[in-house]
Amino acid sequence: MSTFFLKQAQIEKQWIVVDATDAVVGRLAAFVSTILRGKTKPTYTPHMDCGDNVIVVNASKVKFSGSKMSDKVYYRHTGYPGGIKSTTPAKILRGKKPCEVVKLAVKRMLDDGPMARRRLKNLYVYAGPEHRHEAQKPSIVEFASLNRKNRR
């Protein structure tokens, strides 16, 4: 019997909604990245994008464990000499794009390369409780009730 490899036509993507209210960012990102990779499915194939589409709502209400909310530092570079910029999660969550904390955490949980960039396009993060994917009939996953450590 030969090893089963999934074909592109056999992939069935589902839509999953995860509520991030009071969720610990690292645990949420690990859970979402596992779904995006397709590791929760028995038909997982490493070289195919067989993961589901994930919608994260209430991303502005995430929590960090310990004192990471003020001590953790995100760096970026403008491209100019001496152009390194830094910010903290507290500043990002109070700013215009609070979803970036969750997106960046999930991005760093995925591998590097073209497949990870393709999988990251299946992630939709919203700061509030509303999303615009009701037509896809997403299933709701109670992330906070999976483990007592998932909430703060």
Swiss-Prot record:
Q: A single GO BP annotation from the record?
A: translation
Q: Which residues cross the membrane?
A: none
Signal sequence region? none
- Coiled coil segments of this chain: none
The family database entries (InterPro entries) matched by this protein are listed as:
Ribosomal_uL13, Ribosomal_uL13_bac-type, Ribosomal_uL13_sf
Name the keywords, alphabetized: Ribonucleoprotein, Ribosomal protein
Q: Name one GO molecular function term.
A: structural constituent of ribosome
Its GO CC terms are: cytosolic large ribosomal subunit
Q: One of this protein's Pfam families, by short name?
A: Ribosomal_L13
Q: Which NCBIfam families match?
A: rplM_bact
Assembly with partners or alone: Part of the 50S ribosomal subunit.
User: What's this protein's function?
Assistant: This protein is one of the early assembly proteins of the 50S ribosomal subunit, although it is not seen to bind rRNA by itself. It is important during the early stages of 50S assembly.
Which family does this protein fall into?
Belongs to the universal ribosomal protein uL13 family.
The molecule here is called Large ribosomal subunit protein uL13
What lineage does the source organism belong to? Bacteria, Pseudomonadati, Pseudomonadota, Alphaproteobacteria, Rickettsiales
